């Protein structure tokens, strides 16, 4: 463990389905960080060095977001995104990892733990959605946030800003600027990513998760906070911690608190091992 924050390094990894962009920091046991829709690794820009003091932290751009290649539009699903994450782990030679996911990233983390339990040692779910039959039915065919068709006068930029502004700290511009950049890069997936989550049969997958799980509930997130207890109740042995003041952009809104919360969980569920401390990602 180092007291100095490690530098962030970025690169592309070729995998069977897509060329995937990652950002890494630190050395040691690998921890994969998965972002929300329509963000990118940048959501963890200030988290990576903090986790990288103790672990080999990897933030990937989910396929179709950030700088990662996209799948064909019809292929997009939580299951496909999970499979692409495993492709990345295979390419990096990582047989087992811990996973941290926020919003959409939490849904992908759940699928990874359910699909390949032998490869997932621990999972931290930050503001996870809870998708059951009722939610799938309620959202089918309905408009979603970040649905802002392009207009010649640039009105879609203001529409995106105004849709997201209520869920960000009052007076913020920096976090919203970062969101806008990622939303524009994602193109149609900025909205489709939310539909992908709403189609996911999460309720059938949660009981299959067997590794240690910590649900981190941002208390000022009006979408995820009310259902945090349902996620915890559906996973045997899962625990819950609530974060006062945490909002939808929790990882980049409160990076120090986010990292400390994740590290406190990993210290018990996925402890640092001396023989892994010099392992580079």
Predicted region positions:
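Conserved alpha/beta-hydrolase catalytic His-Asp/Glu region
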Residues: 135, 150-208
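Active-site loop/oxyanion-hole signature of alpha/beta-hydrolase fold enzymes
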Residues: 45-46, 58-100, 104, 256, ...
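N-terminal cap/lid segment of alpha/beta-hydrolase-fold proteins
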Residues: 1-19
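Short beta-strand/loop motif that positions the catalytic acidic residue
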Residues: 209, 215-217
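Conserved alpha/beta-hydrolase "acid-adjacent" motif
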Residues: 222-227
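Catalytic active-site module of serine/aspartate enzymes centered on a nucleophile-bearing elbow/loop
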Residues: 238-281
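Conserved HGGG/HGGXW glycine-rich cap/lid loop of the alpha/beta-hydrolase fold
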Residues: 16-69
């Amino acid at each position: 463990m180092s007291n100095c924050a490690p530098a962030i390094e970025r690169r592309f990894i070729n995998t069977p389905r897509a060329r995937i962009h990652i950002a890494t920091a630190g050395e040691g046991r690998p921890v994969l960080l998965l972002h929300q829709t329509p963000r990118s690794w940048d959501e963890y820009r200030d988290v990576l060095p903090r986790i990288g003091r103790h672990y080999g932290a990897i933030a990937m751009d989910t396929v179709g977001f950030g700088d990662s290649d996209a799948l064909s539009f019809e292929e997009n699903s939580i299951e496909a995104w999970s499979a692409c994450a495993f492709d990345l782990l295979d390419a990096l030679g990582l047989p087992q990892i811990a996973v941290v996911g926020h919003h959409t990233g939490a849904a992908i983390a759940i699928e990874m733990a359910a699909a390949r339990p032998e490869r997932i040692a621990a999972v931290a779910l930050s503001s996870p959605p809870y998708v059951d039959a009722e939610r799938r039915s309620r959202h089918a065919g309905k408009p979603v946030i970040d649905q802002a068709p392009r207009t010649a006068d640039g009105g879609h930029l203001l529409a995106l800003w105004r849709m997201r502004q209520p869920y960000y700290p009052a007076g913020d511009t920096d976090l919203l600027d970062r969101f806008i950049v990622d939303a524009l890069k994602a193109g149609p997936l900025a909205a489709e990513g939310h539909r992908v989550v709403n189609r996911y049969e999460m309720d059938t997958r949660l009981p299959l998760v067997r590794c240690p799980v910590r649900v981190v509930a941002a208390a000022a997130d009006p979408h995820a906070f009310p259902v945090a207890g349902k996620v915890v109740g559906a996973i045997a042995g899962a625990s819950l911690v609530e974060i006062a003041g945490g909002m939808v952009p929790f990882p980049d809104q409160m990076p120090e608190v986010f990292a400390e919360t994740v590290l406190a969980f990993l210290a018990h569920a996925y402890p640092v091992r001396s023989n892994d401390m010099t392992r580079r990602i």
